[in-house]
Each structure stands twice: as C-alpha cells, then as structure tokens.
C-alpha cells in the first residue's frame, strides 16, 4: 500500500520514500538487468552449442570472471568498478584461452570447446582457491566470497548507474545481431541458402 501511495500520490513518509528510492528500487532494477543479461547469455550459448543445457559456464567464462574479480579484489580493492573490470577481463581471457586450446587441436567441434572449457574452468577455480587461501581474512576473503556467491544487497543507485549502461548496451548489441547469432544454429548448407 505504501509503494502504491509513493508511486501514485507521493503521500508517504520521507523515510519510506528514501528506503524505496535508495535501497529497494536499485536492487529490483539490478535484478531485472542481471536476469535479462543472464537469460540472453544463456540463449546465445544454447544457440552456439546446439544444446538446450548450455550456459556461460560451459566454456569457463563464469570461472574466469570469478578469478578476474578475485585477482582485482586482492590487488586493488573490492569496490565495484575494479571488481567488475576484473571480472570482464577474466571472462575475456578465459574465452581467449579456450579458443587457443581449440586452435591447437585437429578438430574444432562443440565437444572440443566444452573439454577446453572444462580445463580452463578447473584452472580458474584452482586460482580462486589459492587467492582465498592467501587473502586477508578480514576484508579480501569476505569480498571474494560475496562476489562468487552473488548478492544484490550492496547495490545502490550509484552502483546501478555504473553497471546498468554497460549491461543494457551489451544486450542491445546482442539483440541487433540476433539474426547472425541465429545463423550459427543452422548447418552449413542451411546457412548458405
């Protein structure tokens, strides 16, 4: 009832308005953006790998992102910009490593990518465990744990403004290239016609 009053009449207590606008709304919006991004990433992986069970962790992207974030947390800080940048770099490096591993083989089919992804994912998880072992137990270890578990509890309007534009722009770009991505699900003969 108070949210309804806030949206339509603006006849609420200042504390209620502050809690809604500064705590609840940024978390809800971040949950929507995260969910949309994850579902889009999952759909793209399912298209590329011709497998309805495929997800971003199938070629080590999730583990690489976690390792990148953990490295940046231990080296720089646990603030949102360096951590997100570290996660992006880690995910990108894991994809590049998978591509390099597959390039060195005789065949480059879906199974080869998955096996290379398992190798990269295992290596990244080992790196995360080492970083946790050597991390400062007061701050770094907790920050790494919270990052790997995932939580929206620390999202504020400021953090949302940092993250949302990159996420939304990335999703729009992927949707623009939807036709080309869908062509990946076709066989070579079907794609040529």
Task: Annotate each language-model stretch with its function.
Residues 1-193:
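Alpha-helical transmembrane segments in inner-membrane proteins
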């Amino acid at each position: 009832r108070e949210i309804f009053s806030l949206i339509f009449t603006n006849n609420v207590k200042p504390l209620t308005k502050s809690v809604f606008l500064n705590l609840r709304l940024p978390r809800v919006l971040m949950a929507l953006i995260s969910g949309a991004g994850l579902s889009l990433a999952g759909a793209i992986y399912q298209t590329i790998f011709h497998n309805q069970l495929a997800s971003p962790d199938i070629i080590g992207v999730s583990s690489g992102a976690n390792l990148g974030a953990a490295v940046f947390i231990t080296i720089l800080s646990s603030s949102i910009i360096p951590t997100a940048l570290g996660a992006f770099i880690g995910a990108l490096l894991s994809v590049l490593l998978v591509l390099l591993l597959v390039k060195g083989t005789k065949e480059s089919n879906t199974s080869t990518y998955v096996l290379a992804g398992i190798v990269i994912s295992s290596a990244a998880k080992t790196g995360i465990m080492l970083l946790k072992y050597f991390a400062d137990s007061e701050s770094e270890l907790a920050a790494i744990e919270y990052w790997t578990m995932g939580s929206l509890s620390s999202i504020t309007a400021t953090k949302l403004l940092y993250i949302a534009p990159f996420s939304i722009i990335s999703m729009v770009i992927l949707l623009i290239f939807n036709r080309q991505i869908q062509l990946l699900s076709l066989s070579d003969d079907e794609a040529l016609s």
